[in-house]
Structure formats: C-alpha cells, structure tokens
UniProtKB/Swiss-Prot annotation:
Keywords: DNA damage, DNA excision, DNA repair, Endonuclease, Hydrolase, Nuclease
GO biological process, alphabetically ordered: nucleotide-excision repair; pyrimidine dimer repair; response to UV
EC numbers on record: 3.-.-.-
Listed Gene3D superfamilies: Divalent-metal-dependent TIM barrel enzymes (3.20.20.150)
One example GO MF annotation: endonuclease activity
Task of the protein: Component in a DNA repair pathway. Removal of UV LIGHT damaged nucleotides. Recognizes pyrimidine dimers and cleave a phosphodiester bond immediately 5' to the lesion.
Name of protein: UV DNA damage endonuclease
Organism: Bacillus thuringiensis subsp. konkukian (strain 97-27)
Family: Belongs to the uve1/UvsE family.
Matches recorded under PANTHER family: UV-DAMAGE ENDONUCLEASE
Any single Pfam family the record assigns to this protein: UvdE
Keyword Secreted among UniProt keywords: no
Length: 317
C-alpha cells in the first residue's frame, strides 16, 4: 500500500511566500481606475510567482500533492470587479502548468464553505457556479483541468436535510458537465456525515474525498470498515487513486478545530482500517503547520515497523 502526502496552499518553511495575498473590495473601491488595474495585476503576479516558488520547494522535497490557494486571484469572482486574470498572465500560468506536468504533481482546489448546491435561494446556486467556474478556468489556464479536482462540501441542511439533499441533486444539474466532471465532495464536521456524503457521491458519480477528522466529529451509524471501501470505489472511474484529508483536533474542547501538527494516536485507527483494504491512496494534510506538520507526520509514521519511506513524502506499508 502506497501513501503519498501533500499539504495546503502555504509552505511554512518558505519566508514571505504567501500565494494568497489579497486586496479588500473596500480598499479597491477607493482607488482610481488605473490604480485598481495596477493593484490587481501586482497582487496576482506576486501570488503566481509565490506559487512557483512553492512548487519548486515541493519538487525539491518530493511532495507530490498540493492544494492551490483559492485566493490566488484577488476579487476574481466579485460581481463589480472586471479583470482578465487569464489573458494577463498566460506565460505564468503556462510556466506553472509545465512544472506540474513535468513532475507529475497532483493539484487540487477547495473553494470555501459558501460554494454549495443545497440552498433554496437561486442566487446562492448562481454564486456557487460562478466560483466553480473560476476555479476551473484557473486549472484550464494551467493546462491541468482534465486531471485536477475542485473539492467542496455538500452544504447546509436548512432545517430539513432530506429536502436539502433533493435540492443538491437538482441544483447540481445547473453546473456545466465539464466542471462537474472535475469536482469532488467531502464529508463535513457538523451536517453531512460520511454515509450521507457517500450516498450523494454514488448517485452523482462524484469522487469522495474522505476527511477522517470530520468523520470523528460527525459520526454516523455505519462503521468505517464498511464505508472506506465504498468511498475508495467512488474513484474507480477516474485514473487516479483516492485522496483523504487528515488533521487532528486542537483539543477535546475544540475538537473540530485543527491542531498545529498531527496526533499520530488520533490517526492510527483510520490507518489500520485503510491497511486492511490495502489500496493505494493519497493524503492531504490539513494541519495549521502545513508542510512542517506533514514532514513531521511522515517521519513519525516511517518509524513504525513495516512502514517504509520510499521518498521524502511517500510511504509504503
């Protein structure tokens, strides 16, 4: 069983390398037309250059997974902001894409919790489609839209989970098919359990990104031993291995909050279930210390008998 690792957005080991520098709309409004264009251009350019730095760092550390920042283009989906963020940076997008393809990196996006398809308000669905389209356009500009995924949560329950799930199935039809083909769903820590998310994924033929921390915060009746094989099966129509999210609680009191690093004892039960299935899968680390937490966790895991480190960020068990 091969386990490959990655982390989210910011490389903590790199100085001043945020790929998510931004400008608020309030500040944006105060600028002249030329100043607005210059500011959007400068901030986006810096984010793309920082993304390139991070990718080089990942390659040097043999880190095969990476989640791009959704804030790579500031104010990209704001209705009052017009900015050709694709055409203005074609060489940089292509440079990023060439690096990703040359080193076979697995890239993803994770829009925020407001991108959902369970609302009864049409404008919420419209905004979700706009946001998904933005993420897809970035992946397309990079040249990896057919091999990368945009991960979201199911959404809210709005007092009636059954009705909300029905709305999800209806609203998702409005998302263009080529974008839906590149989306994944994740179980959340309060509303939609692993079993509920799995059912939706199976019906819509959407790959399921399983989050173990969320699962433990929002347990369902079905045991993980039954759920995990079915979760992995949702990836069978793709040409890539399943991906899971790993983090551990900040404390018992703040169970849903992410800790700085990974608590191996918290994760062990999941790993033992995964080992019984013996299916290759990828792990996205969602701890606060990102790449540092990931490398420390890999080091801890590699000291366990039977687990072999075959590269800086890949283990065999």
């Amino acid at each position: 069983m091969i386990m490959r690792f990655g982390y989210v957005s910011h490389a903590m080991a790199l100085w001043d390398c945020s790929p998510a520098k931004t400008i608020t709309f309030t500040s944006f409004q105060k600028l002249s037309k030329q100043e607005r264009e210059d500011k959007l251009y400068d901030v986006t350019k810096q984010n793309l250059e920082h993304t390139l730095r991070i990718l080089h760092y990942n390659i040097a550390h043999e880190i095969p997974l990476y989640r791009l920042s959704s804030s790579i283009v500031p104010l990209a989906t704001h209705p009052e902001v017009e900015f050709d963020y694709i055409g203005a940076f074609t060489p940089l997008w292509r440079k990023i894409g060439a690096l990703i393809k040359e080193h076979n990196l697995r890239i993803s996006f994770h829009p925020n919790q407001f991108t959902l398809f369970t609302s009864d308000k049409p404008h919420i669905t419209t905004n979700a489609i706009t946001d998904m389209t933005y993420h897809y356009k970035v992946l397309d500009a990079i040249g990896i839209a057919d091999s990368s995924y945009i991960n979201i949560h199911v959404g809210g329950a709005y007092g009636n989970k059954e009705k909300a799930i029905e709305r999800f199935h209806e609203n998702i039809k409005k998302l263009p098919a080529h974008i839906k083909k590149q989306m994944t769903l994740e179980n959340d820590d309060k509303t939609y359990t692993t079993a509920e998310t799995l059912s939706i994924c199976q019906k819509e033929k959407i790959p399921f990104v399983f989050d173990y921390h969320h699962h433990m915060a929002n347990l369902c009746e079905e045991p993980l031993e039954e759920l995990l094989p079915a979760i992995f099966e949702t990836w069978s129509h793709t040409n890539i291995v399943p991906k899971v999210h790993i983090s551990s609680p900040k404390s018992k009191k703040e169970f849903r909050a992410h800790a700085e690093y990974i608590d191996l004892e918290f994760i062990k039960p999941f790993l033992h279930v995964a080992k019984k299935i013996n299916h290759n899968f990828d792990i996205m680390i969602e701890s606060k210390q990102k790449d540092l937490a990931m490398l420390q966790f890999i080091q801890e895991l590699s000291s366990i008998r039977g687990i072999k480190r075959i590269s800086s960020s890949t283990l065999q068990w």
